[in-house]
């Protein structure tokens, strides 16, 4: 899926109470990455222990929960036939819970990437104002490096970009890195460690909730949630989840 460059935050690890929530009461907001799903299933069946609780938030007006963190744990448990998972319920609209986005970047041949994007039916248009347009949510992505390109569209176009980058990374055609901060991507670009970065507008919490209410999902790694704490490890036997 690519390497993550996570900003350094001083977030405490905290022992928190968890409750068991039925898996069919949970709603995803992002597409899955097959490799991550397989890795979770291998890990949890190998150890027989579920150690990282789901992080959920109540969907307003519904008896359902938004998956804030834990998409692959949720899908993996479902695949194994489990019925529930230990979960920490967050106050999603609290100021302590932040939502940002990830910025996919690559080292590789720009022309090859552009060609693959166009094969997916995407437009890639040179545009010096692409970054500003992306930040305002007027286009799917800005592709920024030595030159600047606009990729028009919305959610569906973002999914196509994600698919192309994932495939090219698996094929070894590009080195794919996800940045939590644009500034870090620019620093690495100046050092020659990456060639281009894709920039998009981060979704708001309201947009995330509206999306799940419609039964839709973002492309993988669209949201980057930052919480006031990291939940401490738990020790729940896998067999207890069936």
From Swiss-Prot:
Q: Which UniProt keywords apply?
A: ATP-binding, Kinase, Magnesium, Metal-binding, Nucleotide-binding, Transferase
Phenotype caused by lack of the gene? Disruption of gene does not lead to complete Cys auxotrophy, but mutant displays a growth defect in an amino acid medium depleted of Cys.
Q: Where does O-phospho-L-serine bind?
A: 68, 70-72, 102, 221, 223, 225
Q: SMART domains attached here?
A: ParB
The pathway where this protein functions is: Amino-acid biosynthesis; L-cysteine biosynthesis; L-cysteine from L-serine: step 1/2
* GO BP term, pick one: cysteine biosynthetic process
Needed co-factor(s) = Mg(2+)
Q: Which residues bind ADP?
A: 43, 49, 51-52, 69-73
Among the Pfam families in the record, one is SerK_C
Look up what happens after changing residue 36 to A.
Decrease in activity
Q: Where is the active site?
A: 30
Which top-rank group of organisms is this from?
Archaea
Documented EC number(s): 2.7.1.226
Q: Where does Mg(2+) bind?
A: 69
From the UniProt record, list the reaction(s) this protein catalyses: L-serine + ADP = O-phospho-L-serine + AMP + H(+)
Q: Which GO terms describe its molecular function?
A: ATP binding; kinase activity; metal ion binding
Q: What does this protein do?
A: Free serine kinase that uses ADP to phosphorylate L-serine to yield O-phospho-L-serine and AMP.
Q: Which family does it belong to?
A: Belongs to the SerK family.
What's the protein called, per UniProt? ADP-dependent L-serine kinase SerK
Organism, as annotated: Thermococcus kodakarensis (strain ATCC BAA-918 / JCM 12380 / KOD1)
Q: What is the lineage of its organism?
A: Archaea, Methanobacteriati, Methanobacteriota, Thermococci, Thermococcales
